[in-house]
Amino acid sequence: MLTLASKLKRDDGLKGSRASASTSDSTRRVSVRDKLLVKEVAELEANLPCTCKVHFPDPNKLHCFQLTVSPDEGYYQGGKFQFETEVPDAYNMVPPKVKCLTKIWHPNITETGEICLSLLREHSIDGTGWAPTRTLKDVVWGLNSLFTDLLNFDDPLNIEAAEHHLRDKEDFRDKVDEYIKRYAR
């Protein structure tokens, strides 16, 4: 799986023998992001919640992956929700960019896929935003928790969904179920 890891080992082994090589050092240099991702992806795969699956469309590009969350409790039980994650070059100084690809009726996720999760914010007033000490594991566990304990109707991104829940919880549940049947199977 971690083919980038073997590339890093190979590149480290070539450092000494490259002094006379004609290729420039910058074309073979591995970014800090990619070095971090090798370690973080291994940690993530070892500590993945049972309701989550990670897929790397290209195993040589650990900075682009998809996450599937299949909640086993709560309003969203029975659905499969796809997220696309892109880790920018400036990682770990900035958070990954995450978008929900599955249309969903959720107070913290818009129907167009924007996500309200404090640890994905570069700047956060409450101190719970992104910090260089956070990892991909934190991001995945945070996204998973949006379907259970981090489901937040008091500080919504999708105000219409939050107000719907306040007005009529049963109708809210029915609409969530309808979205799951139409978009999240």
Curated annotation (Swiss-Prot):
It comes from Rattus norvegicus. Belongs to the ubiquitin-conjugating enzyme family. UBE2F subfamily. Interacts with UBA3 and RBX2. Interacts (N-terminally acetylated form) with (via DCUN1 domain) DCUN1D1, DCUN1D2, DCUN1D3, DCUN1D4 and DCUN1D5. The gene is Ube2f. GO terms for cellular component: cytosol; nucleus. Accepts the ubiquitin-like protein NEDD8 from the UBA3-NAE1 E1 complex and catalyzes its covalent attachment to other proteins. Together with the E3 ubiquitin ligase RNF7/RBX2, specifically neddylates cullin-5 (CUL5). Does not neddylate CUL1, CUL2, CUL3, CUL4A or CUL4B. Mediates neddylation of the CUL9-RBX1 complex. GO terms for biological process: protein neddylation. PANTHER family: UBIQUITIN-CONJUGATING ENZYME E2. It comes from the Eukaryota. It is an enzyme of class 2 (transferase). Keywords: Acetylation, ATP-binding, Nucleotide-binding, Transferase, Ubl conjugation pathway. This is NEDD8-conjugating enzyme UBE2F. The keyword Nucleotide-binding applies. One of its GO terms (molecular function) is NEDD8 conjugating enzyme activity.
